[in-house]
Swiss-Prot record:
Major localization listed first in the record, in broad terms: cytoplasm
Name of the featured protein: Ribonuclease HII
Keywords from the named record: Cytoplasm, Endonuclease, Hydrolase, Manganese, Metal-binding, Nuclease
Reactions it catalyzes: Endonucleolytic cleavage to 5'-phosphomonoester
InterPro entries in the cross-refs: RNase_HII, RNase_HII/HIII, RNase_HII/HIII_dom, RNaseH-like_sf, RNaseH_sf
Biological processes, Gene Ontology terms: DNA replication, removal of RNA primer; mismatch repair
Binding annotation for a divalent metal cation: D23, E24, D115
Similarity comment: family membership: Belongs to the RNase HII family.
PANTHER family to which the protein is assigned, alphabetical: RIBONUCLEASE H2 SUBUNIT A, RIBONUCLEASE HII
PROSITE patterns in the cross-refs: RNASE_H_2
Amino acid sequence: MKKEDPNLSLFSFLDEDIICGVDEAGRGPLAGPVFAAAVILDPMRPIDGLRDSKKLTEVKRDALAIEIKQYALSWSIAQCSEEEIDSLNILQATMLAMRRAIEGLHVVPTLALIDGNRCPVTSVRSEAIIKGDDKVQAISAASILAKTARDHALGLLHIQYPHYAFDQHKGYPTALHLERLREHGVSPVHRKSYAPVRALLGGVTPANKV
């Protein structure tokens, strides 16, 4: 007799629910929007290899994102802009992006399983699952869509602002990113409420040129 996965069996009582998994990408970076995705998987069309997007190679993530969009019953990707992050704070902006993703589904779920320890305010019944992106396949799928969407967005920002090297660090506070920030100043797509960016502003008008 096959032993059940102790993590996945926690959710076996939800078989009759229409479950969407929800996850975010991009809370830590100094630039660009924060993204969230919601996915309702089709049990009749399983997708092999779903797991936490951070544990997958870029090539594998991109391939799985195509499969998810092709085989899921419904999927939705949403974001909150840098301006919204600075206005609301990153936690509230992340919750808002998650709510937008859930509301963007064309199939209405009866239960949203959220990666992490907090749930967004939404009309859908929600449960937070710590490390859910490695426990629940629908959350894994959402993490992959959110991550690939954000990486694509940062690739576009790299075209617009090539001297920041967004294609290499995706906006995260790496040594290279901080060096380019000091060299070129703060761009319109940087999160001005984040300490490393705020420290560089020091009353100086952000750079607007490419």
